[in-house]
Swiss-Prot record:
Signal peptide: 1-22
Protein name as annotated: Metallo-beta-lactamase type 2
SUPFAM superfamilies, alphabetized: Metallo-hydrolase/oxidoreductase
Function description: Confers resistance to the different beta-lactams antibiotics (penicillin, cephalosporin and carbapenem) via the hydrolysis of the beta-lactam ring.
Organism: Elizabethkingia meningoseptica (Chryseobacterium meningosepticum)
Positions with a binding annotation for Zn(2+) 1: H98, H100, H161
Gene: blaB1
This protein's GO CC annotations: periplasmic space
Cofactor details (free text): Binds 2 Zn(2+) ions per subunit.
Keywords from the UniProt entry: Antibiotic resistance, Hydrolase, Metal-binding, Periplasm, Signal, Zinc
Amino acid sequence: MLKKIKISLILALGLTSLQAFGQENPDVKIEKLKDNLYVYTTYNTFNGTKYAANAVYLVTDKGVVVIDCPWGEDKFKSFTDEIYKKHGKKVIMNIATHSHDDRAGGLEYFGKIGAKTYSTKMTDSILAKENKPRAQYTFDNNKSFKVGKSEFQVYYPGKGHTADNVVVWFPKEKVLVGGCIIKSADSKDLGYIGEAYVNDWTQSVHNIQQKFSGAQYVVAGHDDWKDQRSIQHTLDLINEYQQKQKASN
């Protein structure tokens, strides 16, 4: 009986801790993926429907590298506060994987808190045309980064969700951050394609498959990222869309 009471107390305390975390950060969910790499998920509404946006951050011996940003500027400060609370380190670098607000919307904020901000030259050009905040530093489509003892690579596979979408590869962890060019395995369609290049998308995904065939985890840009069938599902969705387009012509 005493043993059962102890177990009940432990479970109750665990649930209380989880609830407290949720109350402090109702719009930001952080999950450890592998080693010092974490997936963070934020939520926003598009056309009346609530969606999750996924990205990652890497804890290095020099500080924290954030890929993309929380979806919505109202979440920026609580996100960086939570990072400091969890790891005792500040964000020192931010990289946007394309020009949309759920990826590049935090460039100004991260710059203001002292982080170095980066994007490709293609993304920078789009942001400039749209009169939006831009990164402090730009690079050509492919670039390798080394921060302290940690390394990762930015790779441009070709056009897809947008003209400028890139992916990020963490070789030690064997994790690929697909961003919005990779659809979640539970996606019903290609989502927003107002700036997409659907006819190029398939080849771009094949380029990703070939270059990062050793990936153990692929983090899709939206919704469920844990189902690792996301790359194949993306190809299926593209094909489905193209077949419907042919049938309607």
